[in-house]
Amino acid sequence: MRIFIACLLIASFGLPAGQTSQTLRDRYGEPDIERFTAPRDIGLTVEYGSDGQACQIVIERKQPLLHSEKVSNYMSPEAVSEIIDELVPPATRGHSINSMIESMGCAEGRTVEYENVWIARHSDMCVPLKRERESTATVVFKRQLCPVSPYAQMHK
């Protein structure tokens, strides 16, 4: 019995330690991208600037990082609006500067440019409209320490 316990202890020391969030932070520093889970199984992927403030946020149905099966990827417009309003309250966006709608078949993309942020939403607009029809939404902050946004490049 003593030999068995000794072997078990020796074997357990040889196993690699789990990679926790804190272990990875200690080894590599603060992440520049993180993912959070909002209500209704919606994922928020956030890219940070060098100052640690959010620069870009992608809102989409949460999926495993490595996935072989397509998960239902649509969200209700109400849920997406609620999350966007939490992340960027209307009073902080600044005045609306420009808006654009792209439509191809059933796919529709709407981008609104404000003084401080761009907000883009992509939906399946096939009739009859489904309750869950938004595939992604993107919030891009216009800050000096953020990478140049693809939206900024489109509006030069």
Which role does the model predict for each range below?
Residues M1-R2, A11, S99, T138:
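N-terminal targeting/docking segments
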Residues L66-K156:
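Non-cytosolic coordination micro-motifs
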